[in-house]
Swiss-Prot record:
PTM entry text: Phosphorylated and activated by RcsD.
Subunit and interaction comment: Interacts with RcsD and RcsA.
Signal peptide from the UniProt entry: none
DNA-binding region: 168-187
Regions annotated as coiled coil: none
Gene: rcsB
Keywords: DNA-binding, Phosphoprotein, Transcription, Transcription regulation, Two-component regulatory system
Family of this protein: Belongs to the RcsB family.
Function of the protein: Component of the Rcs signaling system, which controls transcription of numerous genes. RcsB is the response regulator that binds to regulatory DNA regions. Can function both in an RcsA-dependent or RcsA-independent manner.
Domain HTH luxR-type: 144-209
Protein name, as recorded: Transcriptional regulatory protein RcsB
Record GO terms (molecular function): DNA binding
Single Gene Ontology BP annotation: regulation of DNA-templated transcription
């Protein structure tokens, strides 16, 4: 791959602007599209000659959803498109499930400014990229004794939305699954993580994210 055509997707215009300005400093990168929701992204993908999609994990879009659901749809319908996830979500269980989707990289928005250019440079060489900030988080969940109890992508998606404040009924509607299915996936995830109630689950999700000292 010589010049790299990139699409950016994020529901915050200022983030789109910042990413584009950052990528404009890389002479071999061309930004060929910017989208603020998943529906616009999917509708325009067939029209664009893109090599890489840089997408937020949490992004509105009624028809195609976001997160793991969106990534799986894109990989199924646009298999040649490389995907780099850019996210504020630093929960290791969720990040691990996203990486299990065989994406090309994941970058934290609160990570080093050089992480995204490094991810693209690695991709240009045919390699995947996991920044140190993400590697530290994945080590954290292993240290907590949950390394052999990996969440499924569907379980991780339910926990991501639960951590964002969605109720089980709202998650069911958003993911187009039954309330019974969502409840079962949430319960299964809680059993794997060794937590018995919602408060303990929220405490766990909070405890395994980066603390201020982790960011130094």
């Amino acid at each position: 791959m010589n010049n790299m055509n990139v699409i950016i997707a994020d529901d915050h215009p200022i983030v789109l602007f910042g990413i584009r300005k950052s990528l404009e400093q890389i002479e071999w990168v061309n930004v060929v599209g910017e989208f603020e929701d998943s529906t616009a992204l999917i509708n325009n993908l067939p029209k664009l000659d893109a090599h890489v999609l840089i997408t937020d994990l949490s992004m509105p879009g009624d028809k195609y959803g976001d997160g793991i659901t969106l990534i799986k749809y894109i990989k199924r319908h646009f298999p040649s498109l490389s995907i780099i996830v850019l996210t504020m979500n630093n929960n290791p269980a969720i990040l691990s499930a996203v990486l299990d989707l065989d994406i090309e990289g994941i970058v934290l928005k609160q990570g080093a400014p050089t992480d995204l250019p490094k991810a693209l440079a690695a991709l240009q060489k045919g390699k995947k990229f996991t920044p140190e900030s993400v590697s530290r988080l994945l080590e954290k969940i292993s240290a907590g004794g949950y390394g052999d109890k990996r969440l499924s992508p569907k379980e991780s998606e339910v926990l991501r939305l639960f951590a964002e404040g969605f109720l089980v009924t709202e998650i069911a509607k958003k993911l187009n699954r039954s309330i019974k299915t969502i409840s079962s996936q949430k319960k299964s995830a809680m059993m794997k993580l060794g937590v018995e109630n919602d408060i303990a689950l929220l405490n766990y999700l909070s405890s395994v994210t980066l603390s201020p000292t982790d960011k130094e």
